[in-house]
Amino acid sequence: MPATMSQAFIGNFLGNSPKWYKTAILSFLIINPLLFFYVDPFVAGWVLVLEFIFTLAMALKCYPLQPGGLLAIEAVAIGMTSASQVLHEIEANLEVLLLLVFMVAGIYFMKQLLLFGFTKIITKVRSKVLVSLMFCLASAFLSAFLDALTVIAVIIAVAVGFYSIYHKVASGKDFGADHDHTSEGKNAAGEDQLNEEELGAFRGFLRNLLMHAGVGTALGGVCTMVGEPQNLIIAAQANWQFGEFAVRMSPVTVPVLISGILTCYLVEKFGIFGYGAKLPTAVHRILCEYAAHEDARRTNKDNMKLIVQALVGVWLIAGLALHLASVGLIGLSVIILTTAFNGVTDEHALGKAFEEALPFTALLAVFFAVVGVIIDQHLFAPVIQWALGYEGNTQLVIFYIANGLLSMVSDNVFVGTVYINEVKAALINGQITRDQFDLLAVAINTGTNLPSVATPNGQAAFLFLLTSALAPLIRLSYGRMVWMALPYTIVLSIVGVMAIQTGFLEQATQYFYDSHTIIHHSAKEVLGTVSGH
């Protein structure tokens, strides 16, 4: 029987999302105008924020751009905020959008070099603990300069490559043969061709490495202004450059990095929380043979491409460290240099590089619409006033925890943007000093980045991993990710809180002032970067 028009509408609306989810979003769209016009705009605003957080938390059911975008369009249409306010937010955060558009695409053209490096780590180093530490540290270093999504994308590509090679060889085929590595490895008679114990151990090994790398991106990403998109927003509002940002964060980020690496060592050493899986000898032999096969096939042309990518990588790090141009423009230069010297001139080949980041860039524009509602309806004013009622380190800890809890269930770009805007408003209104604002900016940045490793909702890199084609192959579920992230969540959150609560952040910052490593900023500088006030 053909579907009725109403059934067809529901079927098309939000695609393959569950029916209950579609009903929830439609209910939100009906309820919001009623609350805004007949109850209270403040209540309606908070309901919208909670609905938006719900769409982010349900990202596995439906990408948040569509449901969140519908809520944002309705909010503008009924007057909760204005289109000009949304545009103002986007203008104020243009550098972040350029970072996502150009930097992520630029690193796409450096994937060969990164693949080469991670492949060598796995095939040359036999100690599982050492491999884990190297993956965690390499991800942390790369994420301090590159986008975390890209770093995870590269490691996923390495893992998929290795999984497919093992699956192919274990199924009785050679390296060059076509093979479906997503099959369960049964022959025509339905019998297992693969050694299940060996395959299970290999899956565990890959899960371990991907989780260490994912946490590594958080450890490195919090350290610099380009490590995560929200860092750039916070740096822009505080008027900090690359070096100053790294120095100001270091009293929290350095102890956290050390404790994170120590956690990596301990969970591997004692095989707890799902870690400690060893790479089977037979699998290692296959991977080494494949790496040797690839090395033998590599031509001078291929080697030249790797050299070009390495040189562009040096330019990228130098350009960012010395602030030779805005982040987005450096990303654009990476695209131009890598493609020009490596001969990527086809328009379709260029277009693939932008596929990864543009959906999230569009989602970020929707974030700014919700931020517009928060500003126009003064939603966070009571919360901020309560937090500002405390003084000194307690105030900093409250902001750290408030950011951390929200970042566990929501996107940290959204959370960081909201809080830094509110603290900036407090500075402009004379409620806090500029020095206290700078300390609060550190608490907001670290609180947004560190506890968010708790769930895939908080870290974009984790969500990207969970929704990748690799996750089901290596049996990496939402619950398993949360469990494996738990030791890191506990350690990173507590060490971050302790660095602030004990006064270490404040004392170290004062030392940096006294040694002229950083300078005192004035509140007047803020007026040039005010967002929506």
From Swiss-Prot:
<dbReference type="Pfam" id="PF06450">
    <property type="entry name" value="NhaB"/>
</dbReference>
<feature type="transmembrane region" description="Helical">
    <location>
        <begin position="67"/>
        <end position="87"/>
    </location>
</feature>
<protein>
    <recommendedName>
        <fullName>Na(+)/H(+) antiporter NhaB</fullName>
    </recommendedName>
</protein>
<feature type="transmembrane region" description="Helical">
    <location>
        <begin position="316"/>
        <end position="336"/>
    </location>
</feature>
<keyword id="KW-0813">Transport</keyword>
<keyword id="KW-1133">Transmembrane helix</keyword>
<comment type="function">
    <text>Na(+)/H(+) antiporter that extrudes sodium in exchange for external protons.</text>
</comment>
<keyword id="KW-0739">Sodium transport</keyword>
<keyword id="KW-0406">Ion transport</keyword>
<keyword id="KW-0472">Membrane</keyword>
<keyword id="KW-0050">Antiport</keyword>
<feature type="transmembrane region" description="Helical">
    <location>
        <begin position="396"/>
        <end position="416"/>
    </location>
</feature>
<keyword id="KW-1003">Cell membrane</keyword>
<feature type="transmembrane region" description="Helical">
    <location>
        <begin position="28"/>
        <end position="50"/>
    </location>
</feature>
<keyword id="KW-0915">Sodium</keyword>
<comment type="similarity">
    <text>Belongs to the NhaB Na(+)/H(+) (TC 2.A.34) antiporter family.</text>
</comment>
<keyword id="KW-0812">Transmembrane</keyword>
<dbReference type="GO" id="GO:0005886">
    <property type="term" value="C:plasma membrane"/>
</dbReference>
<keyword id="KW-0997">Cell inner membrane</keyword>
<feature type="transmembrane region" description="Helical">
    <location>
        <begin position="131"/>
        <end position="165"/>
    </location>
</feature>
<feature type="transmembrane region" description="Helical">
    <location>
        <begin position="96"/>
        <end position="116"/>
    </location>
</feature>
<feature type="transmembrane region" description="Helical">
    <location>
        <begin position="481"/>
        <end position="501"/>
    </location>
</feature>
<dbReference type="InterPro" id="IPR004671">
    <property type="entry name" value="Na+/H+_antiporter_NhaB"/>
</dbReference>
<feature type="transmembrane region" description="Helical">
    <location>
        <begin position="254"/>
        <end position="274"/>
    </location>
</feature>
<feature type="transmembrane region" description="Helical">
    <location>
        <begin position="454"/>
        <end position="474"/>
    </location>
</feature>
<dbReference type="GO" id="GO:0015385">
    <property type="term" value="F:sodium:proton antiporter activity"/>
</dbReference>
<feature type="transmembrane region" description="Helical">
    <location>
        <begin position="364"/>
        <end position="384"/>
    </location>
</feature>
